[in-house]
Amino acid sequence: AWLSVNLLTQLRRETAACTAVLPYVLRRGCTRLPDLEAIAAELDGLYGAHITPVVHKLGEIQAVGFEADFADDGALGEEIFPRLAADVADLLLHPNTRGGLLRPDIVDSERTQLIARIRAAVNNKRSYARERLYTHMCCCEDFAVPRLGEEADAERIHYRKLTMRYHDLLSTSPVEIFYCGSIDGKRVARILTDVLSTMPRGALDEDIGTDIRMNALEEQPRYVTETLPVAQAQLAVGYRLGTCMEDPDLPVLFVLNALYGGCVTSKLFLNLRERLSLCYSVGSQLDTHKGLLTVTSGIAANHYERALTEITAQLDAVRSGDFTDEELRCAIRSAAGDLRARADAPDTLAWYWLNRTVQGLDIDPPEMAALVEEVTRDDVMSAAAGIVCDCVY
């Protein structure tokens, strides 16, 4: 079974690192389970359950909290969920403090770990290139802030300031809780309401959300080059989805992405990698919160011009309807299959619902997959028509 508790807050440069370190600090212990050893013993008693700190970025919203992976009561024939829910609530609400402040030794230790995580981002060159693209492409927007914040801000984390941020988050953040398991929903709600009843709540921050920019920042795409000692160059191209984000039709966007570069039968994969051998890897990613389509590709540096030309040409082909019925069928099958697979594992299902909830949508994965299967050629061409290239990294 699965439980996730997420506190939502606006992603801002000045608070991102502070917010990102919090679940790691809280996971180190609470008044009832004061250290990692006590927590480990408690979780062993719950058949090896896991409670993990999480930091997500959903458009310009930062979500922090805990995920718990544990044996389902129905399979065990005994109740462990109430105890596990109490453990998660205690870690969240009753942290290890000294004089009413988060413990300096724990904060210092987790600050060092956070800085190490931020520095390690460069090791995954593909996702690093995408993050650097966002930094330049969305330079005037909150979306430019990385999920874990900036290293310079992480270095300034102090236990007094972090304690203030913690109390602020608890009282003002909307909270999204997802449970996946065999217990009746009403009973789950009762248990969670009970264990979280001491959570201090003030005026909720109703202003959190993502600002969607329809057009590129400048008339012509911007080009950014950074030099790193790498065996394989990384090319990342950022597009704004444009006018279709005025009333986004997610099923159409899922099919558009699958057709363009989101699966192994896509335009980008079959042409850039298979037919022309211009890259080692290529794919497109969709951010439906922010209205972005991103292409990332591992290339030989001397293939840069040709690869960029071909990436543009394949999007033009999607725009003009230059794709076969079979290509469209494969894209629909891939997008629908991905959605149905989300329901197969509790973690991917909870992640799906967190995204939909933030978007204000109440459509489950099978329903979304059914809508994907109704997408037409004209739908895809219409959505692709407004896409504009903003930045090339």
What are these regions (language model features)?
Residues A1-C18, H167, P174, T193, ...:
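His/Glu-based metal-binding/catalytic segments typifying zinc-dependent metallopeptidases
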Residues D105, D207-Q220, E326-G337:
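Short proline/glycine- and acidic-rich turn/helix-capping motifs at secondary-structure junctions
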Residues I115-A120, E218-Q232, G337-P346:
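Short, low-order "capping/linker" segments at domain edges
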Residues T19-R27:
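Active-site SXXK
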Residues M381-Y393:
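Bilobed periplasmic-binding protein-like "clamshell/Venus-flytrap" ligand-binding domains
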Residues A1-T19, L36-D90, R117, R126-A152, ...:
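M16 family metallopeptidases and their MPP-like homologs
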Residues G29-R32, D73-G77, H94-R103:
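Short, polar/flexible loop-turn hinges at active-site or ligand-entry regions and domain interfaces
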Residues Y159-V195, V392-Y393:
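Non-catalytic, conformational "gating/processing" segments within enzyme and secreted inhibitor domains
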